Amino acid sequence: MPHIQIDINKDLKQDDKKMICKHVSETFSTVMKTGKDHIAISIREFSEHNLYLGQVTDSSSGVVLINIDLRAGRTNQQRDQLRIQLMEALSQITLIPVEGMYVTYTEHQGEDFHLSNRKLDNWRL
């Protein structure tokens, strides 16, 4: 918990991917008041026309689709704060405008999350 999937329709430099992972994990940890050792992040790069977002009229300016699987019970305020901070940071790193970004949250019970050495049904900061 959580798994944050970032789909983007451009190629990223390795340093940009590292910055994204660092920022996403730190932001999630701060906003959700949790540790970082259980955060999973996937970055998937696609060619320009392999991602679509209806409000984007020119896909060459970029599209970012973010799917966040997280534990049930987070407040709307936490979710809004996370969305805003992630979009702003991703825009700064990728130069894709926030209007080209879309965030989806999927909630799970704690027992749905597992690391190699433990279930994450009961966690502590």
Question: Where are the regions a protein language model picked out?
Answer:
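Interaction-mediating elements
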Residues: 1-125
